[in-house]
Amino acid sequence: MDVDIGCYFEEKRYDDKLLDFIRYDVKTPKKTKYILQRPTATDEESVRLQRFYQLGVDLKLKYSKRRSLKKQGRIKNATEELLRLANEQLKLFNRIVERETNWIIYPLWVMAKQLIRLANESSELNKDSIEECGRTIHRSFTICLNDRNPRLNENKKIGCYMFANLEFSIYHRLSNKDMIKNLVKVLESRVNARDIPPLNKSLAMEHKSQVVLYNYYLGQYYGCLENDHERGFFHLNEALLQCPMLYVESTGKFVLQGQMEKIMILLVPLALLTKRLYPHWDHPVIAGVITRSKRLSQVYPTLVRSVISGNLSLYEATAASHERFFLSQGLHVVITLLREVVFTRLVQRCWQWGNDRKSIMPLKILLATKQHDSSANEDEEEQLDALECRLASAIASGLLRAYLSHSNRCIVFSKKEPFPHSK
């Protein structure tokens, strides 16, 4: 069966056969033959389409040869050549897309996605090669962003978020925080100006994984880079709620999307910090994530337990032993701020159980717990001074409603909600 690539451009549509032609790693069925016949096209369009067709054929051929080279241990050069061809194909397709309507957005995204996959396959690729891929994908993004087609049902702006996700991926690979920040600012300014549709009215809504991914990247940006923890929590929570899952009745378990682990790694500490929300480890969905993730199972149950119990020594031990992990995830600031939450919880427990909820509590009651970090060489007065400083910090940050009496060495709690953020 002949499949004419030119017909798709004549009819302004795509199907799985066109997508399979674009995907270099999809083998062409024996009874299928891709051809190009488009006699009505102008000379310039014909040249571009012919080149696009030839690049598609070359990529499939190069990929099949790459598989044999992989067995011989000569994979590096083959990968670089495949990446070069894929980048050239996307550059050319960008020029074709400029004159098309939004029917072509998804085929363009498939092409850009496979370029990123190629770039991520090899850890040996130099920075320049990855940046070149990023520039080509950015061109795809700007074509969508700046489309001036007055017919909204044909406008390519609906594809902005899907290409933004690809750009986020590249910038994270390059550890380029400035480019991430610029991309977020561009998108938000355009949304606020009503120049592009919001996420829930974009093409991403037809591909829910893209909605999950976009909210994940925004949650990571606000929660870990901008330290806007409330906003970070909001986007990560949205990402989690949109994650697809499948319940397998025969096993009684949930099959979860892999992205959920990444979301939970950021969401759990942000939920503890901003909302005092604790995960229910016995919930079947959360249990499924924990079972699959060594990082989650080894770190977070202990961290959550330290916050709930107000156990400062357990918190300090957890933060110290997993410091490298928290740094790699951009969570160092969040975990540091959690220390005040743990301390406040400790104060609350002393107020509840050691002081019978009286409004005035001597500081010696709190000091007697010996769970705050103090030096063995410090005398009691020095320890009380250090404790007052910590309490003053908690009061100033709004974690406690109280005031300190230095002369009486006590803390006086508000009679109405002395612990406003406790759960």
Swiss-Prot record:
- Kindly list the residue ranges recorded as spanning the membrane: none
Entry-linked Gene3D superfamilies: Winged helix-like DNA-binding domain superfamily/Winged helix DNA-binding domain
Q: Which domain of life is it from?
A: Eukaryota
Please tell me what else the database record remarks about this protein. Present with 1510 molecules/cell in log phase SD medium.
Subunit info? Component of a COP9 signalosome-like (CSN) complex, composed of RRI1/CSN5, CSN9, RRI2/CSN10, PCI8/CSN11, CSN12 and CSI1. In the complex, it probably interacts directly with RRI1/CSN5, CSN9, RRI2/CSN10 and CSI1. Interacts with SEM1 and THP3.
* Role of this protein: Component of the COP9 signalosome (CSN) complex that acts as an regulator of the ubiquitin (Ubl) conjugation pathway by mediating the deneddylation of the cullin subunit of SCF-type E3 ubiquitin-protein ligase complexes. The CSN complex is involved in the regulation of the mating pheromone response. CSN12 forms a complex with THP3 that is recruited to transcribed genes and required for transcription elongation.
Protein name as it appears in the record? Cop9 signalosome complex subunit 12
